[in-house]
Amino acid sequence: LPDEVENEIEVYIDNDCAGIELKTGAEVGRVYRRDDGLQDYVDHLYESIHGDLTGLNVCIDCANGASAAVAQKLFPRLGAKCTFIGIAPDGQNINRGVGSTHLENLEKAVVEGGFDCGIAFDGDADRCLGCDEKGHEMDGDKIIALLAMTMKEKGRLDGDTAVVTVMS
C-alpha cells in the first residue's frame, strides 16, 4: 500500500473507525462455498513447480496448520514418497510441539525413519525449515541458496538475484 493510504487507515483505526458505517447482519455480504478450492490451489502449485521429486523419501511436518491438507496432496503428486506428521489441526494445536518451531521432532523422525530429508512448515505455511538425512538442520539461508543456484542453472533466476527479507 502507498504510505498515504496506510496513514489514512491508521487514522481510522486510531479513532475507533469513527465516520465509517460498519455493516452488520445481512448487509455484510454472502458466503459462497467452493469445495474445489483446495484442489485448485494444489493444481496451481503443481503447475508452478518445475521439478520431479521421484525417488525422494521425505518426512514433512505440517505443524498442525495450513499446509496439512495441501502438502498431503502436492508432494506425492510431485513424485516424492512421503510420511507426514503434524497433520491433525483442530484449531487449537497449531505449532504445538510440531512444525518449524519444534524442528527437533522432525530431525528425530528423519533419522529414525531413514528419510532422505525433512521439511517443517510453520503454522500458516509461509516459512519452512529442513533437515538432511542425518537430522542436521538446514536453515532458510541454505534453502534459499540451494533454490537460487538451481534456478540459476536452469536459467530461471531473473538477474541472477534472490531477494529476501531478514526473516528469510
Predicted regions and their residues:
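Gly/Ser/Thr-enriched, mixed-charge loops and adjacent short helices
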Residues: 1-113
